[in-house]
Amino acid sequence: EKVAAAGFHAVEFWGWKDKDITKIRETCEKTGVSVRAFSGMEKYSLCDRDHTEDMVEWIKRSIQTAKMLKCNTLILFPNHFTPSGCADFRDKYSHDAMVANVTHTLTRIAPILEENNITALLEPLCNTGADAGMSVTSTALGADIVRAVASPNVKLLCDLFHMQIMHGNLLNNIMSNIDIVPYIHIADVPDRHEPGTGEINFDFLLPAIQESGFEGTICFEYFPEGDTEAGFPAAKRLFDL
């Protein structure tokens, strides 16, 4: 309700298992706010071949949840997360093997997504600190995987926070893959707070993306520096650039 009052028309959330899906659906119907995407992850990793079958079954369940919410987008990470950081499989697989596993699992999932008109977004993440074992960390590698899967229902999510930490060159990386990027996450670096609190020049970046003809979703995924609602104007301002 607060999101609707602030002038936003869609939301995203992380995992669905601990959520009251019926209440979310009812609130969306009441406010006119839609669920644009949510995480389709649980305790399984795309990069571990031993998780493939479990991941396929979990995606089927996530798709049913998505349909309840009239949502057509799931977000997938290369590695799942534990309380202490991302699951680390470096002792089990080489990096090339992990990348092959991600490609394999997404290829298995793709026909299920296509049958249900659901899109899965692969999100490369940074491998700093407790997440040192993250297997897909760059836009270029994520794009290579998505192109190898070659499904209209498997695309790439560009998270500007992770991109800036891992390699920068944000605009060129997005533009060179714009055909497979329907979704962008926004947060500033270094602390993942709202736009304007760090080093990313959103006043340059967002107009350039919009001028390219981008028609996808731009989602604010940040930890507020202060009060959540107080941060809404800083986010809303970017839509007026």
Residue ranges and their predicted role:
Residues 15-17, 41-44, 80-82, 124-128, ...:
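Active-site-proximal loop/turn and secondary-structure-junction residues that shape catalytic pockets
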Residues 1-5, 70-72, 136-158, 162-241:
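Histidine-acidic metal/acid-base catalytic patches
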Residues 16-29:
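Active-site-adjacent beta->alpha loops and helix N-cap segments on the catalytic face
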Residues 12, 37, 75, 121, ...:
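Conserved beta-strand positions in the central sheet of alpha/beta enzyme cores
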Residues 49-155, 165:
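Active-site acidic/histidine proton-transfer and metal-coordination neighborhood
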Residues 9-10, 34, 72, 119, ...:
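Residue-level detector of anion-binding/catalytic polar loops
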Residues 32-41:
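Short, structured active-site "lid" loops
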